């Protein structure tokens, strides 16, 4: 049962449907090397509450968090992830 994921540096892409349907996943911390998050990457993760997205991320598919309504994005102010959160009405916290 995957509850928390902390990625090591070196990971650059979170692929399509990578964590789709992980229904107990609560927290994800992406590596500082991640650049993109694919379609449905975190789809149907109802317990996902926190995802830490670094400034290095410059692409997030519009459906990356589809049907994961409880997620809050933690990201630096002015980052692409912040803009994505605002545009998609996803709660976010600057850090």
Positions of predicted regions on the chain:
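Structural signature of tandem-repeat unit edges
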Residues: 1-13, 23-36, 45-59, 68-83, ...
């Amino acid at each position: 049962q995957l509850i928390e994921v902390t990625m090591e540096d070196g990971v650059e892409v979170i692929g399509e449907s990578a964590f789709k349907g992980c229904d107990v996943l609560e927290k994800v911390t992406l590596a500082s090397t991640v650049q993109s998050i694919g379609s449905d990457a975190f789809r149907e993760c109802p317990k996902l509450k926190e995802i830490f997205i670094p400034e290095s991320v410059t692409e997030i598919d519009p459906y990356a968090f589809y049907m994961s309504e409880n997620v809050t994005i933690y990201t630096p102010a002015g980052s692409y992830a912040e803009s994505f959160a605002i545009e998609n009405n996803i709660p976010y916290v600057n850090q």
